[in-house]
């Protein structure tokens, strides 16, 4: 269980408007809250996809 998410590893959880799920292993958070988004990114919850380097993704590049 990730302290920032209310679900067990692999389950789904809600990460709607913030980037608090950076280390979350939930499958839904992986898609909706990218670990490569910079802190404070307002677009993190819009289904961005990480591209290579840890600081680049499709919505906050």
Swiss-Prot record:
A divalent metal cation 7 binds at residues 50, 57, 59-60. A divalent metal cation 3 binds at residues 15, 19, 24, 29. The keyword Glycosyltransferase does not apply. PROSITE patterns: METALLOTHIONEIN_VRT (PS00203). A divalent metal cation 1 binds at residues 5, 7, 21, 24. The keyword Acetylation applies. GO terms for biological process: cellular response to cadmium ion; cellular response to copper ion; cellular response to zinc ion; detoxification of copper ion; intracellular zinc ion homeostasis; negative regulation of growth. A divalent metal cation 4 binds at residues 33-34, 44, 48. Keywords: Acetylation, Cadmium, Copper, Metal-binding, Metal-thiolate cluster, Zinc. Metallothioneins have a high content of cysteine residues that bind various heavy metals; these proteins are transcriptionally regulated by both heavy metals and glucocorticoids. Class I metallothioneins contain 2 metal-binding domains: four divalent ions are chelated within cluster A of the alpha domain and are coordinated via cysteinyl thiolate bridges to 11 cysteine ligands. Cluster B, the corresponding region within the beta domain, can ligate three divalent ions to 9 cysteines. This is Metallothionein-2B. It comes from Oryctolagus cuniculus.
């Amino acid at each position: 269980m990730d302290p920032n998410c209310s679900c067990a590893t692999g389950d789904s959880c809600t990460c709607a408007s913030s980037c608090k799920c950076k280390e979350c292993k939930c499958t839904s958070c992986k898609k909706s809250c990218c670990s490569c988004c910079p802190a404070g990114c307002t677009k993190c919850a819009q289904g961005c996809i990480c591209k290579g380097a840890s600081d680049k993704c499709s919505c906050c590049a």
